[in-house]
């Protein structure tokens, strides 16, 4: 039965590897409780999914889109962008003020004293494995 079903499906999905991906995804959907669009006839889920594809009760494009969506970990949402993004507002407006910026200086001895005061975090059970 499966050989005949696969031969019927090749007309709908030309690439056999893609057919396997789509049919296995549909079989997992059926196992998860998705409604079946044809009579089961005591067939297992992979055969039912192949028969659904062969009978065109499900379109391969819809299955492909559903498969891609199920594999995505992050769905990108288009958000409207603000019309004008202000430049760094904290930057000085006139170029002469750039030379007046002060930076804190630290000597190597100050850095070493600061590092000596740091305490490593306590080891947890997860770290020891």
Curated annotation (Swiss-Prot):
GO cellular component, one term: DNA-directed RNA polymerase complex
Catalytic activity: RNA(n) + a ribonucleoside 5'-triphosphate = RNA(n+1) + diphosphate
Chain ranges passing through the membrane: none
Top-level enzyme category: transferase
Keywords from the UniProt entry: DNA-directed RNA polymerase, Nucleotidyltransferase, Transcription, Transferase
Keyword Transcription among record annotations: yes
InterPro entries in UniProt: DNA-dir_RNA_pol_omega, Pol_omega/Rpo6/RPB6, RPB6/omega-like_sf
GO biological process terms on file: DNA-templated transcription
GO terms assigned for molecular function: DNA binding; DNA-directed RNA polymerase activity
Protease is among the record's keywords: no
Region of interest (Disordered), ranges: 77-98
Assigned EC number: 2.7.7.6
Superkingdom of the organism of origin: Bacteria
Quaternary structure, from the entry: The RNAP catalytic core consists of 2 alpha, 1 beta, 1 beta' and 1 omega subunit. When a sigma factor is associated with the core the holoenzyme is formed, which can initiate transcription.
Family in the record: Belongs to the RNA polymerase subunit omega family.
Free-text function comment from the UniProt entry: Promotes RNA polymerase assembly. Latches the N- and C-terminal regions of the beta' subunit thereby facilitating its interaction with the beta and alpha subunits.
Protein name: DNA-directed RNA polymerase subunit omega
Organism ancestry: Bacteria, Pseudomonadati, Pseudomonadota, Alphaproteobacteria, Hyphomicrobiales
Gene (name only): rpoZ
């Amino acid at each position: 039965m499966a050989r005949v079903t696969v031969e019927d499906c090749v007309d709908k999905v030309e690439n056999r590897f893609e057919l396997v991906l789509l049919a296995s995804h549909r079989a997992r959907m059926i196992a998860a409780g998705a409604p079946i669009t044809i009579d089961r006839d005591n067939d297992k889920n992979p055969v039912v999914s192949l028969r659904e594809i062969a009978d065109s009760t499900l379109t391969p494009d819809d299955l492909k889109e559903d498969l891609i969506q199920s594999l995505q970990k992050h769905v990108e949402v288009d958000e409207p962008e603000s019309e004008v993004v202000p430049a760094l507002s904290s930057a000085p407006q006139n170029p002469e003020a750039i030379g007046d910026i002060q930076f804190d200086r630290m000597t190597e001895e100050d850095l070493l004293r600061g590092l000596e005061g740091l305490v490593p975090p306590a080891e947890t059970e997860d770290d020891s494995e």
